[in-house]
């Protein structure tokens, strides 16, 4: 959530910056609500002062033996008007709050301005896509030939956009997640966490999925109980660890990592990536989250992105890094890098990680703060998150990049200890 004071005092500038994201801020509505709020607040304050004075005069009139009934009636009337004024203020503030919750984060000055993914800027590449001397198979064909990747049975169980993995491919999927967790905890300084997969609405509001993106979530409603939502990413549960907290500066940075399933309705993805594991309702992801002092968040973004890149480098998978333009960034991000891995069957790079600095946007929604050692006062932390990596898409990349002419799959060197010494699948 943006700073309401910033929105009030720099409304036109905020609107212009949001316009670069393709978001049209309802300036007229905000101005109208602010004008109403000021009018009602001024009237309420004047009425309160008048009521206080009238209450004081009751005692004085009583001492003089005067009839105080008219004064009492005035005080009661003013009390009713005050209550109405406070209710009106609450209504206006509630509408302003809902508006604020629907506004995306402001892009950082270093973010390239653009309308959509076509205007993202490539930052760097690593590795060279392999030139195969045989017809390349996609991961579906590679996995289905032995029955180890079974979309038909998954559809029988759950419908479209689910996968059933068996045998060595299931083991390879598990090996990838274990390798990622070990790398981030042993080499990159993250603390492993096991989090709930079901969260309630305040957690999703804190990280920005609610109220705007409820259609993208799977919701579980039970009569007489608060609704649950299946997490779309462990970013939700990991970041909300600090919700409502005032941290000691010495605790920062906090670095969490978790391997969880993620659940997404893919409401806007009709017709896209209908074959295979690229876009699923349920998929595993290793998620990294950092909670840092404000002055260190952009340095942390470079570190976080490098942590995700290291996974791809050790797996020897070619990839590129993009700086997302203003029109392609996620709702809560002030700056984002996407990592895209080479997928041979599609002859292009596909997203495998998104690493974002959210600034104080999520922290303000969650009221996550730290005590500034210089001032002694609580201030909002900055939050960052990134995939390290999406496990299913990494599996896709490994299957396709390590395939052999006979359909067998070589096991990447770094995964062999997790595969019980298996060197070839198939």
Swiss-Prot record:
EC supergroup of this enzyme: ligase
Protein name, entry field: Serine--tRNA ligase
Gene designation: serS
Quaternary structure and interacting proteins, as annotated: Homodimer. The tRNA molecule binds across the dimer.
Keyword tags: Aminoacyl-tRNA synthetase, ATP-binding, Cytoplasm, Ligase, Nucleotide-binding, Protein biosynthesis
Entry EC no(s): 6.1.1.11
NCBIfam families the UniProt entry points to: serS
Cellular compartments per GO CC: cytoplasm
InterPro entries: aa-tRNA-synt_IIb, aa-tRNA-synth_II, aa-tRNA-synth_II/BPL/LPL, Ser-tRNA-ligase_type_1, Ser-tRNA-synth_1_N, SerRS_1_N_sf, SerRS_core, tRNA-bd_arm
